[in-house]
Amino acid sequence: MTLIAFELSGETPEIPTAEIVGVLESENIPFSFKCQLEQVFIIETPGIDAGLTDILASRLAMTRHIIEVSGVSPANLTDIISMAEKVDFSNLNSLTYIVRAKKIKRKSHISSEDIERGIGKVLYDRGYRADLVNPCIQYRAIVSDNTCIFGPVIASIDSSAFERRKPHNKPFFYPGVLMPKLAQALVNIARVKEGSVVLDPYCGTGGIMVEAGLIGASTLGCDVQRKVLIGAKINLDFYSVNYSLMFQDAGSMALRNNCVDCIVTDPPYGRSALIQARSLDTLMQDSLCEMYRVLRPKGRLVLVSERPVETWAQNAGFRMADLFTQRVHRSLTRRITVLDK
């Protein structure tokens, strides 16, 4: 069995781990939870090959690095060096290396530089060659909650693509939409994978559909505002994803029963929006019943709201799977409700 550590980005305490679990489950990667430290999530698995590593690296939005754990020690320099001396580095052979250390929220009294020098000396004394510019392997030591997790980095996540897909960088911009990093995380929590059919019944400018489509899902979107539907088409065409758009009310969708695998949506609840002569509460009740109807058995709905929706969801037939909160600013805290059929 292999220990795998995920170094998390730290935007929220719970969403990053939930998206990791969602991707592992969607890709049928066997694993068991080992432990969690601040901004570090550790699992045990029979092994992750290069193909699965590439999938994880391309999917995860709120992870920075994935590490194959070689050693664990208390977070003091003596124990860290002692741990490194027991690590088998024979897989390096003639490859070059670099050692990098990260202190989570800088709570430890030892410096990252001392950790890097201490572990680097262990490798140097064994005859291995460092390369600070273009190393073949990066070893990473993460210090969190008085514990040091050490091992080679098997994948790093490039977040620059999410920056490039921010709403103001897309061909069609409309305010008040989710950032792509969060949208991708919610898609992962919904257990979307390549080939899934994903519905966003309040699709707006198509931000969630873009993230699901880039995974390889077939996406469906509904909205009652023609302007934003046209904008969604512009954005979806720009990213060349597989999509269908429908001008229709989320409370009465022209879709057959049990026809979608996953639903990920950010309804206009509590915000100014064009709603066809009904209250937002009534719309939410009706749309949750419709989402339950069109979702396949064992499918998952991930819904963003500003008020509790649990009662309406349970009345529609859903089972609560999880609930997360994300503070946006002083007057807005998002509720992310995960519901299973």
Range-by-range predicted roles:
Residues 87-92:
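N-terminal, Lys/Arg- and Ser/Thr-rich interaction peptides
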Residues 93-104, 108-131:
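Long recognition/docking surfaces used for binding and targeting
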